[in-house]
Design a protein with these regions (language model features):
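Ferredoxin-like alpha/beta domains used as RNA- or RNAP-binding modules
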Residues: 1-101, 128-197
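Beta-rich strand-turn-strand
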Residues: 104-107
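Short, well-ordered loop/turn sites that connect or cap secondary structure elements
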Residues: 113-114, 133
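Glycine- and Gly-Pro-enriched alpha-helical subdomains that act as flexible
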Residues: 117-120, 125-127
Length: 197
């Protein structure tokens, strides 16, 4: 499946809060559908629960199914808890770091800034949103949109990053831990979903 370009609030209503997908808050707190909220309680199958957790991750970080499967396979080969390593790889992507630094309102916007060449890493222009940032790298931008967004959307910056709002620069201090990830997701269910692939 290619990149999702459809209605984003509909996804938020179905899956719950996804801070990387949109800044909008839905008016109704039940899933979208023709006949409104269902009156009967339907039991969710185990497959559906795992699929929804996987979809949360995909939509929040804006990755395709193929990319996510590649991240899962790479996390399996590494030493350590597979679920935490998967989340760490997704969180250390350049577009995610730009979003976490407060330079963009969503990960989608951060992805666009990166692909348009508005972000530099250690003084080099990087146009690949999936670039894996490592400890000690400095992310900088002099582009007007990013400088404005850093003043507007600057929320709480995670402790693994440091930011200088005046110069629109940020630095990766250390690798992200599970407690610093802002998305509510059960990574073990995602690993179980991909266990047959």
């Amino acid at each position: 499946m290619a990149r999702y370009r459809g209605p984003r609030v509909k996804i938020v209503r179905r899956l719950g809060e996804l801070p990387g997908l949109t800044t909008k808050i839905p008016n109704r707190n039940y899933p979208a559908g023709q006949h409104g909220p269902s009156s009967g309680m339907t039991k969710m199958s185990q497959y559906r629960v795992r699929l929804q957790e996987k979809q949360k991750l995909r939509y929040n970080y804006g990755v395709s199914e193929k990319q996510l499967l590649g991240y899962v396979r790479r996390a399996r080969r590494m030493k350590g808890p597979t679920g935490e390593l998967l989340l760490q790889m997704l969180e250390m992507r350049l577009d995610s770091i730009v979003y976490r630094l407060g330079f963009a309102p969503t990960i989608r916007a951060a992805r666009q800034y990166v692909s348009h060449g508005l972000v530099t890493v250690n003084g080099q222009c990087v146009t690949i949103p999936s670039y894996q940032c490592s400890t000690g790298e400095v992310i900088k931008s002099t582009a007007a949109p990013i400088v404005e967004h850093s003043k507007t959307y600057g929320g709480v910056v995670p402790s693994h990053l440091s930011v200088d709002k005046n110069n629109a620069t940020g630095k990766v201090e250390r690798n992200v831990t599970r407690s610093q990830i802002g998305l509510t997701v059960n990574e073990l269910l995602i690993i179980e979903f991909y266990s047959r692939k």
